[in-house]
């Protein structure tokens, strides 16, 4: 990857490099930063560690959690519902590809990773013969419960393929609509917690956390959102299933991934990261990378389709 490539007139310099944005794409040059002095432990994981039976799956209700193997991601059940996707033109930081706003209806509950996929979870995949045996660099920040980084969209797809095979269940990446619905958790504000970035709500370039513009934080280091999900914005960017379109004209209204009518060599990323300015953490913000990009602020979380 060509780092620090100036592909646009819009540039926001962020400590270790400059973040460039054009036509929905973000590129950046980064460097290892001085580590913070303190680490906040993540919440304890669920004790469930076996594939759900059909009866157990049908009994699930919103905010229930489950794990389908010892090293599988902990999943949180998200309710069905409708929301307004995108942002109004009046929202600070709004870009044209966040419109037009439109109603999306998620007809069935589904499960979302309670946390971003961690190094522990990724390394278990590689050790089990999955993930193409790839061991991404942790930049010297540590592995364990930190989110996996330096993974491409292709890498993320290899992980969900392994997870699906291991559990016999339908794991996948989130659609962009599912992501925004789960991030907003019933809100229509710029951020999941309000219209201002505030202090210590997330890990970004200027979020007031001990990790800001330095490195990733252990997953679960900040308060959960209204659906009980952690780090839905900030910490690491997250790969989506969708291809990139420059507006929502013609977007699906059912929450499914939008893969028609676009160059799918590039896929949507959401959430912002430890390296990005606060505006990139807005619930509606969207941009894209080519599927082979591996960056030290880029990771993912998983979703799972549930039985009706």
Annotate each PLM feature.
Residues 1-25:
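Sec-dependent N-terminal signal peptides
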Residues 27-55:
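Compositionally biased, proline/threonine/alanine/serine-rich low-complexity intrinsically disordered stretches
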Residues 48-68:
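Short coil-to-helix leader/linker segments, especially the first N-terminal amphipathic alpha-helix
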Residues 67-133, 151-154, 234, 241, ...:
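A short glycine-rich, aromatic-capped structural motif
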Residues 76, 111, 190, 238, ...:
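Residues embedded in well-ordered beta-strands
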Residues 84, 88-94, 137-145, 151-285, ...:
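Functional-site microenvironments in short loops/helix caps that host divalent-cation chemistry
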Residues 99-101, 107-109, 143-146, 214-216:
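Short, solvent-exposed beta-strand edge segments and adjacent coil->beta transition regions
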Residues 296-308:
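Short, structured beta-strand segments at or near domain termini in extracellular proteins/domains
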């Amino acid at each position: 990857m060509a780092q620090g490539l100036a592909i646009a007139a819009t540039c926001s310099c962020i400590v270790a490099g400059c973040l460039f944005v054009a036509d929905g794409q973000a590129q950046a040059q980064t460097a290892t930063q001085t580590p913070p002095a303190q680490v906040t432990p993540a919440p304890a994981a669920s004790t469930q560690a076996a594939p759900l039976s059909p009866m157990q799956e049908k009994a699930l209700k919103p905010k229930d959690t489950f794990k389908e193997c010892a090293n599988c991601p902990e999943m949180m059940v998200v309710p069905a519902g409708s929301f307004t996707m995108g942002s109004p033109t009046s929202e600070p930081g709004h870009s044209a590809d966040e419109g037009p706003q439109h109603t999306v209806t998620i007809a069935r509950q589904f499960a979302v990773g309670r946390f971003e996929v961690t190094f522990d979870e990724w390394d278990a995949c590689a050790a089990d013969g999955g993930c193409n045996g790839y061991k991404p660099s942790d930049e010297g920040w540590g592995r364990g419960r930190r989110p996996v980084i330096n993974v491409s969209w292709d890498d993320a797809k290899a992980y969900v393929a392994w997870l699906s095979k291991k559990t016999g269940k339908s794991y996948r990446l989130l659609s962009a609509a599912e992501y925004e619905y789960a991030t907003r958790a019933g809100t229509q504000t710029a951020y999941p917690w309000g219209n201002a970035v505030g202090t210590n709500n997330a890990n970004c370039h200027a979020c007031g956390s001990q990790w800001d513009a330095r490195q990733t934080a252990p997953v679960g280091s900040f308060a959960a959102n209204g659906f009980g999900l952690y780090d839905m914005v900030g910490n690491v960017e997250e790969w989506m299933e969708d291809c990139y379109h420059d507006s929502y004209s013609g977007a699906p209204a059912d929450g499914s991934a939008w893969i028609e009518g676009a160059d799918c060599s590039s896929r949507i990323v959401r959430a912002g990261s430890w390296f990005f300015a606060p505006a990139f953490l807005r619930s509606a913000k969207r941009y894209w990378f080519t599927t082979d990009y591996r960056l030290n602020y880029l990771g993912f979380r998983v979703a799972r389709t549930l039985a009706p």
